[in-house]
């Protein structure tokens, strides 16, 4: 793994962790953080060489940058599906629902036919961008990823290095 990729993953994980670094975090939030970060440390990433063409399964107007609590909850519920036990899922939801919107990470959720169907985290670091924690309710995350990468809110042309850290439900 190259230095930039290591650094951007470290920044993303620190960003997630900081949301429960408060005076009185709940036990559940801390346990959820431990689960989430343990999973994050067991993933592989790759550098994207060619920007994929937008796939028609997800429309750009069906992908939203998370900017209010209800979308945070939807993001949290989608992410929690990565864990098999309902207890672990509840802990991860408790942890992720503490997120406060701030740079360098942005959360995104995707909808298909009005139903939550995908989520991802976008971390920006210099002229590098990491799309991570990609979860989809379908077996193919490529269609969500292609539309997200071409989403007007990302301004992808600003980034010389794009890294992908996939994960499927």
Predicted feature descriptions by range:
Residues 104-119:
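Conserved beta-hairpin
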């Amino acid at each position: 793994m190259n230095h930039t990729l290591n650094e951007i993953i470290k920044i993303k994980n620190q960003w997630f962790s900081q949301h429960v670094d408060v005076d009185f975090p709940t036990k559940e939030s801390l346990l959820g953080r431990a689960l989430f970060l343990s999973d994050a440390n067991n993933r592989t990433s790759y550098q994207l060489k060619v920007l994929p063409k937008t796939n028609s399964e997800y429309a750009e107007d069906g992908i939203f940058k998370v900017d209010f609590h209800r979308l945070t909850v939807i993001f949290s519920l989608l992410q929690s599906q990565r864990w098999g036990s309902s207890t672990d899922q509840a802990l991860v939801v408790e942890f992720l629902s503490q997120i406060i919107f701030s740079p360098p990470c942005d959360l995104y959720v995707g909808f298909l036919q009005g139903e939550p169907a995908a989520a991802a985290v976008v971390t920006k670091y210099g002229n590098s961008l990491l799309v991570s924690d990609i979860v989809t309710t379908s077996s193919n995350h490529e269609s969500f990823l292609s539309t997200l990468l071409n989403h007007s809110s990302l301004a992808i042309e600003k980034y010389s290095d794009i890294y992908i850290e996939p994960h499927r439900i």
